[in-house]
Design a protein with these regions (language model features):
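CN hydrolase (nitrilase-like) catalytic-core segments centered on the catalytic cysteine
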Residues: 1-69
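A short, polar/proline- and glycine-enriched secondary-structure boundary/capping micro-motif
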Residues: 14, 71-72, 92-94
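Residue-level signal for alpha-helical context at structural boundaries
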Residues: 20, 73-74, 96
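A short, polar/charged loop-to-alpha-helix boundary motif
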Residues: 67-84
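Cysteine/selenocysteine-centered motifs that mediate thiol-based redox chemistry or coordinate metal-sulfur cofactors
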Residues: 79-98
Length: 98
């Protein structure tokens, strides 16, 4: 699973939601996205913390408030999905040298 903590403002909330789903899908893993709620002198924060599965489906969503989210992660279903769609095999072997 990936844990992604952030401080995305209200005016970018759809970007936040989209990126959570994208990270879960591209890594074929469960993802916990934790975003700030409330306001400060510069911005208002949307919250929208969520638990997302390896297909990009939202398992739990906190909406605009602080909340503890709980969901069951099915590692067998995840492994079966990775076998059916082995995207990791598309990785190129390369090195970055500076």
């Amino acid at each position: 699973a990936i844990l992604c903590s952030a401080s995305w403002a209200d005016d970018r909330r759809e970007v936040w939601r989209t990126l959570l789903r994208a990270r879960a899908i591209e890594n074929q893993c469960y993802l916990a996205g934790v975003n700030r709620v409330g306001t400060d002198p510069d911005a208002s924060y949307a919250g929208d913390s969520a638990l997302v599965d390896f297909r990009g489906a939202t398992l739990a969503d906190a909406g605009e408030r602080e909340q503890t989210l709980v969901a069951e992660f099915d590692s067998e279903a995840q492994a079966a999905f990775r076998e059916e769609f082995p995207a990791w095999m598309d990785a190129d072997g390369f090195e970055l040298e500076f």
